[in-house]
């Protein structure tokens, strides 16, 4: 947590995004963008660790600054408001902000598309489905009552349909389909989803983490992020784990979600391969992404809390990945740069942007996972 204090002093009133591996200097944003919640989440984790009221006040003040994003048109509100407020525990203001964001997301849910659209707040096309628009959104929506839980389930399943391809449909888990003209209506946990347009041919050979929608042609795969984006798989695994921990979301589709988890674990050898994956699996000698590893480790620890035959191996692997990150990729004390930096995170391999840097969300998930190992946080609630 010393690194959090150093970062706080360095960024002033701005939100940290990524830090240079040579000197630890942060690139920052004024309003937080999609990563703002990870900074406030880190501050809440520090407050839990220190049990210092001054640290709680600091975390609360930064969290309040997320409020303008509550009604913003972006599915990344799941990342912003779940991870930015859930570590706050019983803090009433953080809970109220989370509930406000959940209601706004539910209002923005599109029942025709069966998801909360990616949105236009960050620029670019609005009608996208992206793997990073699912984590956080599932538990956030689930907190908005039965309608929210149904929307969370539909949002997740639509992304699994698209991002995992046909293999992602293994183990339908009680989903009923009925043809209604050119529309395919699916029931998930008592809620209807309608696939409008559908695919225009077979799914691509390699599942894509991002899709765009057009009323004339339906869902079409995007080339960016690339199909081998390891963080995309990590985000999906995290969302599936959160759904499996929430019966109101998993409902009768638990078998399908379990199959999706199995597919995601197998695709990149998560349980037995490299602890830190390449940022793009099609470039095995390219940049690593420790943030993908940290996200995956937390997802594994969550899956370990789901009763079943893989719980023990997920627990062991999640802990092993966290220990590897802490031992091999975190800076120690010495001249030139701060201690406690989780290096070798890759912001955007395709653009060559911040490819071996400290990333604020990598820091958050490493801290969250390590806190869970010492029972400092309940991963079924964060």
Regions found by a protein language model. Give the residues of each.
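Glycan-recognition and catalytic cores of secretory/periplasmic carbohydrate-active enzymes
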Residues: 1-382
């Amino acid at each position: 947590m010393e690194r959090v204090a150093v970062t706080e002093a360095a960024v002033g009133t701005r939100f940290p995004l990524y830090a240079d591996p040579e000197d630890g200097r942060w690139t920052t944003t004024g309003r937080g963008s999609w990563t703002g919640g990870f900074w406030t989440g880190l501050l809440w984790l520090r407050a839990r660790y220190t049990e210092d009221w001054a640290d709680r006040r600091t975390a609360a003040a930064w969290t309040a600054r997320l409020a303008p994003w509550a009604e913003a048109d972006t599915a990344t509100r799941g990342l912003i408001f779940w991870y930015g407020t859930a570590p706050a525990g019983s803090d009433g203001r953080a809970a109220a902000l989370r509930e406000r964001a959940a209601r706004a997301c539910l209002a923005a849910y599109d029942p025709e598309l069966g998801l909360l659209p990616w949105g236009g707040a960050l620029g670019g096309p609005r009608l996208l489905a992206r793997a990073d628009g699912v984590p956080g959104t599932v538990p956030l929506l689930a907190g908005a009552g039965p309608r929210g839980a149904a929307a969370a389930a539909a949002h997740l399943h639509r992304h699994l349909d698209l991002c995992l391809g046909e293999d992602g449909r293994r183990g339908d888990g009680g989903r009923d389909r009925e043809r209604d003209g050119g529309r395919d209506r699916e029931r998930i946990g008592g809620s209807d989803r309608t696939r409008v347009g559908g695919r225009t041919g077979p799914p691509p050979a390699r599942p894509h983490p991002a899709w765009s929608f057009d009323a004339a042609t339906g869902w079409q795969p995007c080339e960016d992020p690339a199909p081998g984006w390891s963080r995309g798989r990590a985000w999906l695994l995290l969302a599936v784990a959160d759904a499996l921990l929430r019966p109101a979301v998993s409902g009768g589709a638990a078998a399908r979600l379990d199959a999706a988890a199995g597919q995601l674990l197998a695709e990149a050898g998560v349980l037995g391969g490299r602890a830190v994956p390449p940022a793009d699996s099609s470039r095995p000698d390219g940049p690593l992404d420790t943030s993908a590893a940290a996200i995956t480790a937390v997802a594994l620890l969550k899956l370990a809390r789901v009763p079943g035959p893989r719980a023990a191996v997920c627990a062991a692997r999640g802990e092993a990945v966290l220990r590897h990150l802490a031992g091999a990729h975190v800076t120690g004390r010495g001249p030139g740069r701060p201690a406690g930096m989780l290096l070798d995170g890759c912001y955007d391999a395709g653009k060559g942007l911040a490819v071996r840097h400290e990333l604020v969300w990598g820091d958050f998930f490493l801290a969250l996972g390590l806190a869970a190992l010492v029972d400092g946080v309940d991963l079924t609630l964060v």
